[in-house]
């Protein structure tokens, strides 16, 4: 509000002269005109206007800040996912800075529960829009909630197309998140294929600035298989490269009959830009999650409680006990038990 007051004040400076030199009616009209001029300038200047009102990112001048915030938040809050950190930052940053994208950005995040898929999609949303998942430009779909009935799949297809078309018309930089892709009815997601393709315009609307993120547990077995192979061969998880997993992951998801991507045209036509694997989390990563959660609640870290919580998690495979079977998902509830918050 101070910025608006300052703008209005500057506009009124020429009017601050002795009252006798200006007729009352003229003065009133001049003040009204100056106020209108200041307000017009306010709404026509994106940086000032977007300071007070949420703006579509395509109309904002601070796209670079979104990429920087994404990098900072992933570095500080995401553990054990070097591939995710590297690929997501490069993909999103490059896309936001590309003024001539040929298609929307499509990211497919895969891994076990609790490894950080929802967390990363939340961070991406918050990096682009201050209100994050609550932004009117961010749209989240949960398969079991929004598309529960197989017999209604044609209705869902029409609704989904209408929703995407309407919202991208309002904001080209809309973000769409599809959770529980492994529980989505096969064929439904193919209805959005035209929006992810290389069309310049569809019925007068361009979708090339939009971002689509898909979350799924499908392919987690393949990711674990690769991670275990590296571990058994004495190599660290950080040695794993995207090329070691991505192709096998996309094939696994495409052929998984229990996945919403089963024989999907989105994969068949190469419209998913990145299949991003979330590695299963180890004991040390669980401890990192516990520590950050305690600190986020404003409490001193009790190392004994931290260790006890990590020890209570169940790990797999049964003999090696390397990976947490729930990742960091139940850390919150366990902290409630140990701390008198």
Predicted regions and their residues:
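Pre-Walker A (pre-P-loop) alpha-helix and adjacent loop at the N terminus of AAA/AAA+ ATPase modules
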Residues: 65-105
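Walker B catalytic acidic pair
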Residues: 179-181
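Short glycine-rich substrate-engagement loop in P-loop NTPases that contacts/grips substrate
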Residues: 135-171
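Walker A/P-loop
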Residues: 103-139
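C-terminal alpha-helical "lid" subdomain
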Residues: 2-5, 16-38, 122-126, 277-341
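Conserved catalytic/switch belt of AAA+ P-loop NTPases
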Residues: 165-166, 186-213, 217-221, 226-240
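Conserved AAA+ ATPase "SRH/arginine-finger" region at the nucleotide-binding site
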Residues: 206, 216-218, 226, 232-266, ...
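Extended, charged/polar low-complexity intrinsically disordered regions
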Residues: 2-68
